[in-house]
Amino acid sequence: MEKCIKEQAKQLTPSAIKYLMATAQLCSAGEGARCVDVAARLNVSKPSAHAMIQNLCSLGLATKKRYGIVRLTPEGEAQAKLCEACYAPLYERMHAALALDEELCRSVALNVLSQFYERIDELAESLNTENTAYPMKEMYSL
């Protein structure tokens, strides 16, 4: 998995991480999600969601049949869980300590994840988040 993380680190932008986590949340019931659901969740256009889902598929983090359901691969699920475990504490700490605007905190937390993605295991450990679950629904005003 470490090799995969290093290969993907250069390609996982803050936006890709956001889509990965949103897709994971939508797929949590085990039924998968549609691009239109991801678009609605993130308040983006359907073409934008489709393009980013295709990007996640090309990285081996998701699968999608034409006009079908999006599902995360086991690697995608693992990466999404790791990102979620880091995202929420980063967001909460910045929001509490710096009193920044919520949207700015979201953006900065995603940028931190993207910049330190190669070392995300260390980041998760340092944030002491191994057994803490933070629902994405609270992070995004949906």
Functional labels for PLM-detected ranges:
Residues 83-97, 101, 119:
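Alpha-helical linker/hinge and terminal dimerization helices associated
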